[in-house]
Swiss-Prot record:
Source organism of the structure: Staphylococcus aureus (strain COL)
InterPro entries documented for this protein: Csa (IPR007595), Csa_sf (IPR038641)
Entry similarity comment: Belongs to the staphylococcal tandem lipoprotein family.
Name of this protein: Uncharacterized lipoprotein SACOL0482
Major localization class: membrane
Signal peptide: 1-22
Residues lipid-modified (N-palmitoyl cysteine): 23
Length: 263
């Protein structure tokens, strides 16, 4: 009888040990995608793309090659389209956006774009054209300057001091980001990863300082990419930091770097 009790106890200990090891393995897989898995490939692809941040001198894009699909003509070196935009909607108020987009043409080595201020209608989520302000800009010597006279000194100064996220963003600790949610569509091909960030994250602190984001809520990071996962060149890379997302109250920051055919 005593022998049976000891045997039962031994079996129970073995089963418990196997169960604990299984849980640890599942937890580790959730935090760190298994090497060779689609999740690991997605994270590796983003890691290669984000490794180029920051590019402090935008003129470096003239020498940077991107992912070319069938839409590119043979003699077209391509154009980089970079965008950064902050979206704010205080509780119970109108949603407003302000940001810039710049077309960096590798054929002509010229860069032109727009600085845009918009109001978004809450009823249909569309831009209120009566409230939209659009200013043409160009890049000269890594500096953004208006191409037309601007009487509003505040806006003029904002344009001249504008920095794209790609110029100051830093993802050197991206490999340490854990518990990501991944998706992949091989037909497009497009893929994404979502992470919960902390307030001490470098990029979060930069955005709070540059755009006066006062909320203490920890943001979510959404990464969206396009192109061949195995290709080392950048095709399309979208970044979104969501600080607040509620009905009638929103704060988020959008940034994108995209390689497109020249017009």
């Amino acid at each position: 009888m005593e022998y049976l009790k000891r045997l039962a106890l031994l079996i129970s200990v073995i089963i418990l040990t196997i169960f604990i090891m299984g849980c640890d393995s599942q937890s580790d897989t959730a935090e760190n995608p298994k090497e060779g898995s689609k999740e690991a490939q997605i994270k590796k692809s983003f890691s290669k793309t984000l490794d180029m941040y920051p590019i402090k001198n935008l003129e470096d894009f003239y020498d940077k090659e991107g992912y070319r699909d069938g839409e590119f003509k043979k003699d077209d070196k391509g154009t980089w389209l970079i965008r950064s935009e902050i979206v704010k909607q205080p509780k119970g108020k109108v949603m407003k956006t302000r940001g810039m987009q710049l077309y960096i043409n590798r054929n002509t080595e010229t860069a032109k774009g727009f600085f845009v201020l918009k109001e978004i209608s809450e009823n249909n989520n569309r831009v209120n054209k009566d409230k939209e302000e659009k200013y043409e800009v160009k890049m000269v010597g890594n500096k953004i300057i208006p191409t037309e006279q601007i009487n509003d000194e505040k806006i003029k100064k904002e344009i001249e001091n504008f920095k794209f996220f790609v110029q100051y963003g830093n993802f050197k600790n991206f490999e340490k980001y854990n518990n990501g949610e991944f998706s992949y569509n091989p037909e497009a091909p497009i893929y994404s990863a979502k992470y919960q960030l902390h307030n001490d994250d470098y990029n979060v602190r930069q955005l709070r300082k540059r755009y006066d984001i006062s909320t203490k809520e920890t943001p979510k990071l959404l990464l969206k990419g396009g192109g061949d996962l195995k290709n080392s060149s950048v095709g399309q890379n979208d970044i979104e930091f969501t600080f607040v997302e509620r009905k009638g109250e929103n704060i988020y920051f959008n940034d994108s770097v995209e390689f497109i055919p020249s017009k």
